[in-house]
Amino acid sequence: AIRGEDLHYPRTGLICLENAHSSGRVLPMEYMKEVYSLARERAVPVHLDGARIFNAAVSLGIDAGEIASKADSVMFCLSKGLGAPIGSMLVGTKEFISRARKGRKIMGGAMRQAGIIAAAGIMAIEKMIDRLGEDHENARYLAKKLEEIKGIEIMRDRLDINMVFFKLDQGRPEAIVDELYREGIKINPPEGDEWRLVTNLDVSRSDLDTFIARFTKAVKSC
């Protein structure tokens, strides 16, 4: 909520959105438009954490620029789904970027000889965006196969991009993680009672079948 002019509280100086969200959900464009319109009326800038903006664009069937147009500044990640080894991009007006570069220098965030990183980033932008739909399809395939395992509940309302969230009402999480490690698969334990799996360019449909077989075995034995 945007604060009013009550003298007891500071004014709202920035609205931050994330699309796609780390929960796996994609914000609809109608919501983005509403927030941006309200922010402009109140003269409050909007920053978009677009670490997964290209995944959101694929999910919505639109260009990433359309999503970015409903924010004053955007950050997007070159690793994650795009596959670069490191790096993010900050996007905004010329004046904004000038101030950001100054701030980066003040904070000691500059990097020397970073051209090789830029080369990987260019490759990610030019070659990797068009294949993100494959990751989304693999996530849905993974979700479908996981549902065939007794005791698994897929969070279907959060299956918008390349993330699969699920709950498992059997087996001991720590034992399952250890058993999979012995089978050559590393997996994070659940946060609370919720597991998260993410598909990417390094995970093939064959890899998913292998994982499902070994995960099923681990669940039954633990």
Q: What does each model-identified segment do?
A:
Residues A1-Q170, E174-E183, I187-E194, V198-V203, ...:
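Conserved PLP-enzyme active-site core in the AAT-like
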